[in-house]
Each structure stands twice: as structure tokens, then as C-alpha cells.
Amino acid sequence: MRSLSIFGATGSIGESTFDLVMRKGGPEAFRTVALTGGRNIRRLAEMARALKAELAVTAHEDCLPALREALAGTGTEVAGGAQAIAEAADRPADWTMSAIVGAAGLVPGMRALKHGRTLALANKESLVTAGQLLMRTARENGATILPVDSEHSAVFQALAGEDTACVERVIITASGGPFRDWSLERIRACTVAEAQAHPNWSMGQRISIDSASMFNKALELIETREFFGFEPDRIEAVVHPQSIVHAMVGFCDGGLMAHLGPADMRHAIGFALNWPGRGEVPVARIDLAQIASLTFQRPDEERFPALRLARDVMAARGLSGAAFNAAKEIALDHFIAGRIGFLDMAAVVEETLAGVSTDPLFGKVPDALEEVLAMDHLARRAAEEAAGLRQQKR
């Protein structure tokens, strides 16, 4: 029986993963080693019961008594806190879903790779902050990383069986978010509610706002660089409002291989769960005649400066990605709290990168996770200062 763990089980990716696992037979088909979640204890306990999980972990120690009570008599072990989540990753599983949002997902993902099994990576911050270290850890342990972002899953599939030396360019698509047709002045004055109203995808607040600012796409450009190893000048993003084409790969013979799929994360999750084969996934099928047209345009970097900043990070490499991600997370916190404006987020990130670029760690290829965490901490402090100054100017 195949074993699995789901980190971030109660988030949107975790819920979709749980749904697919249950459709494939649940506890009759899989041995669930570990499930982790946040404060939604009721849902975490429901999942643990349904999958007969060996271990359930909440990220918050104060929620542990409630989890213990909810799973009393089931035989499922319970634990709480960040250290408990990291230790859960030390339990070997054939297939692990890494879906914890933000830099918090880095530690369990790294530890899971050391078993030499398969890591389905939905946590893009892991590749952005520590891509070179992550990929090296996978190689050294004979582990496989499968991308779960719809764009990177699409690139992965388009490259199957291909000679990467013949790849001329990789194009990932962006919906453009809710502001794709807004003027710069209108974007500058947008509210949190407007920023989180995504036109195509059903997502959480933070990732929806990241999509609106195109910071999500900026992270994905860096992720493409780290996962597939292509030079920055061969990686680009285009705005594709229909969200049907997820990525394209251009080859040296002039051919362009495109991957089309529904705007449903279960497609990419299902591919990772069924890999190296394919299996039934309950998503809508594409009717090209009904769609009628697919459109593409280049993004406006004046309105969406995150893309320009991403190219700087792709060129610098080292731990610049860790600084970029940390600054982005702090800037997003301040925007959601109403302390800075929407366009101030990019300014905070740019000022943070400039401020920490003189640190020896900035351009260094990390040898250990501690270096990644040190740069993350340094950049967060710098970003807090930059955001504070922006707030004073409002």
C-alpha cells in the first residue's frame, strides 16, 4: 500500500488533495502517515478520521488540547507546534504534499526530501527562497520533486521526453488578476477587498492579492528558473485572461508546445498524485469551440513592477530569492492591515533588496537551511523598516 503525508491539509491545496485521495480509495488505497493543519481543528480531525491518519499535527500549540479531544479514541497520534510539523516530515512517506503557505513550508519540505521519495511541491516559496539547496538535497537523496503550481506542472509535462538543450524559451501565463485593465491611478487607490477578488481562480486572501499585484507570477518566474534551470533570458510571462493555457515551451525547431487545462488546481494535484502514470481527475473538460478565442499580451511592468524585480532576483540568485519572498510577505501584511497602499508593496520589496544586497549572504549559494533562515530574518527586519517609513509618508 502506498503511503502519503499532506502538509497544509486544511488549506485549499490540501483540501483538493484530500478530495482526490478519497476518490482514489482513501484508507483502502493509501496509508496516511501524517496530516498537518492550522487552527481549523474540526476539519483536521475529520480528515484524520477519514484517512485513519497515524499522526495529526496543528501548527499552533494552543490548539493541541482541542485536537487531542477531537481525535480521542481513534488511535491517531497528535502533536502541536512548528517543531512537531518538522518532525512529522521525518516520518517516511512514499508521496508527500507540501502545501503549507509561505516560508513556513520550507523546513518540512527539506526534511521530507531526505527520505529519497516523492515530494509534490505546492509551496512555491521553498524554491524561491532555497531553490539551489532544495534541488541539491533532492539529487543527493535520489528524491523526486513534482511541481504542483499549474504553470510549472504544465512546463514539466511539456518537457516530458524532450532534450532541454533544444529549449529556446519557457512561457508561463498569468490571468492578469482583477486589475489587468485598470489604470495605474486606479490601481494605486485600490482596496484590499478589490485586490482579493480574483476573476478566474478560487483562492485564499493572500494568494489572491499576490495574483492582483503579480507578485505571485514573479515568484513563479523565479521558481521556473530554480526548478528547470533555464537562464533568465529564456523565461517570460504573458497575460492570458482565459487561464486555459498554463504554459508554453518553445523549441529550437520553431515549435511551441502548449499545455491547456481547466482553471482547477485538482488538475495539477491529480497529475502529481498519479505520476508517473495518469489517472482520472474530476475536473471540467475543455471545449475549445465554446471558448472560441484565446488571447495573450505582454504585462505592463509599470503597473506590475514585481515582474521586473523578479528578473533582478533571477540574475542575482544565491539568497536573493529568500530576501525577495520575506520582503513580499511583510509588505503584504502591511497592505492587508491598511498601513500601506497597493503599489507600496513593490516599493517595500525593492527598498529591502537594495538594503540587504551588501550582506555576504545575499548572493551566496546556501550550504545549509540556517543560511536561508538568516537571510529571511534579515530581510524581514529591513522590510518592516521600509514599510514603516512608507506608512509615515501616507
From Swiss-Prot:
GO molecular function: 1-deoxy-D-xylulose-5-phosphate reductoisomerase activity; manganese ion binding; NADPH binding
UniProt: NADPH binding residues: 10-13, 38-40, 123, 125, 204
Recorded metabolic or biological pathway in which this protein acts: Isoprenoid biosynthesis; isopentenyl diphosphate biosynthesis via DXP pathway; isopentenyl diphosphate from 1-deoxy-D-xylulose 5-phosphate: step 1/6
Highest taxon listed in the record's lineage: Bacteria
Protein name in the entry: 1-deoxy-D-xylulose 5-phosphate reductoisomerase
Bridged cysteine pairs (disulfide): none
Family classification: Belongs to the DXR family.
Gene3D superfamilies linked: 1.10.1740.10, NAD(P)-binding Rossmann-like Domain (3.40.50.720)
GO BP annotation list: isopentenyl diphosphate biosynthetic process, methylerythritol 4-phosphate pathway involved in terpenoid biosynthetic process
Amino-acid positions noted as binding Mn(2+) in the UniProt annotation, renumbered to this chain: 149, 151, 220
Enzyme Commission code: 1.1.1.267
Keyword Metal-binding: yes
Cofactor field: Mg(2+); Mn(2+)
Binding site for 1-deoxy-D-xylulose 5-phosphate: 124, 150-151, 175, 198, 211, 216-217, 220
Function: Catalyzes the NADPH-dependent rearrangement and reduction of 1-deoxy-D-xylulose-5-phosphate (DXP) to 2-C-methyl-D-erythritol 4-phosphate (MEP).
Substrates-to-products reaction catalysed: 2-C-methyl-D-erythritol 4-phosphate + NADP(+) = 1-deoxy-D-xylulose 5-phosphate + NADPH + H(+)
Keywords: Isoprene biosynthesis, Manganese, Metal-binding, NADP, Oxidoreductase
Gene name of the encoded protein: dxr
NCBIfam families in alphabetical order: Dxr
Source organism: Cereibacter sphaeroides (strain ATCC 17023 / DSM 158 / JCM 6121 / CCUG 31486 / LMG 2827 / NBRC 12203 / NCIMB 8253 / ATH 2.4.1.)
